[in-house]
Amino acid sequence: MQPLHTLRAGVIGTGFIGPVHIEALKRLGVQVTAICGSTKNARATAERWGIPEVFGDYDYRAMLASPNVDVAHITSPNKVHVEQSLAALAAGKHVVCEKPLGMTAKETAKVVAAARKKGSPVFAVNYMCRFFPAVLQMRAMVQRGDLGRIIHVQGHFFQDWLLHATDYNWRLLASEGGKLRAVGGIGTHWIDAVSFILGARAESVFAHLETFHKTRHRPRGERQTFAKVDPRTMLPYKCDTEDFGSVLLRFGKAQHGFASGVHANASISQVAAGWKCSLALGIYGTKGSVRWDLQQPDEILVGRRDEPNQTLQRGTAGFSEDVAGFTDYPGGHPEGFPDSHKMHCRAVYQHIASGRKSPALFATAGDGHHEVKLCEAVLKSSRARQWVNV
């Protein structure tokens, strides 16, 4: 296998998530050789992280033409993901694209077609929740049949960073982030994690969406995600994306015999006061259940009807041996959000370095395309008040 430190990455985007990718790559020893964004932000990011090549004025095509970049990380706003993904594939670069893959299924289908061409580079979509050891453990338990036949799944993804009408981010605008904001932005992480655990995709949905702040306020200029702004300097605008979503899902046939035809329900909110980033899910089967919450990332609760419930911790004998390869620290040393990104990047880069011989546990272009199709079905269902096939 080619050593990971010989691979070179270029990152497009300098907002909140771009530096998360850079940090993950640095921890793996991957060379980050190029950064692309606005000239000011790209230079500042390069100086902070010691990145040698800077491509300002959002000139991503120049970065993709660089012989010093093997893998392109696309961490730019949603509306340009498809354009940049297609350009990266055409330039012969492997791609790690932030979710969502694109704004519409019609355009993401083009990425799938390009990524599936013979000899095309590796393409991954960053649904990194797959790489929490707890999620991998839940997947192993389901696939072994430890929980029996899976009956249903329930859970939520709650945040509060857009609780106030004066909270602002470009994702609030359908023209920038897409028509489905809460479900599309964070809910798809929940849905992808469940799909990964079950080994099955959602085939139909019934959804209710609600926008509580019909009028919001935005700053006069640009600002970074989570940055604070004086409300007195803000301007009102009509918000056209949802704050909350409740989604019922029916999953199709699983890759194994324990999780076909599963029903699920999820509540998604970005206005849940007090919850900063709570992704919780429970898998319920005929023999037992297992529950997990991102805010306690190293623990899962196993439930039985006729036996005592158990709390299993990462780094102990309760977790499967094959999960150990996705953890770097001993039990009692929590691994969280940054570590899931690191493990996702490790899986992608090992797949590249091995000539595609290592397992591709990461989400592919096809997976990203399916999530965009699902988001379109959620929108259609909420408007029609009926079940819609994905």
Language-model features, listed with the residues they occupy:
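Beta-loop-alpha module in the N-terminal Rossmann-like domain of NAD(P)-dependent dehydrogenases
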Residues: 51-114
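Predominantly a Rossmann-like dinucleotide-binding segment in NAD(P)-dependent oxidoreductases
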Residues: 121, 129-239, 300, 385
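Hydrophobic residues in well-ordered beta-strands that form the structural core
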Residues: 56, 97, 103, 123-125, ...
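C-terminal helix-rich "cap/oligomerization" subdomain common to oxidoreductases
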Residues: 1-6, 71-73, 116, 296, ...
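Glycine-rich phosphate/pyrophosphate-binding beta-alpha loops
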Residues: 188, 267-276
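Glycine-centered short loops/turns at secondary-structure junctions
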Residues: 29, 92, 119-120, 145, ...
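C-terminal glycine/acidic-rich active-site capping loop/insertion
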Residues: 214-240, 246-258, 281-282, 286-362, ...
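N-terminal Rossmann-like dinucleotide-binding module
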Residues: 1-50
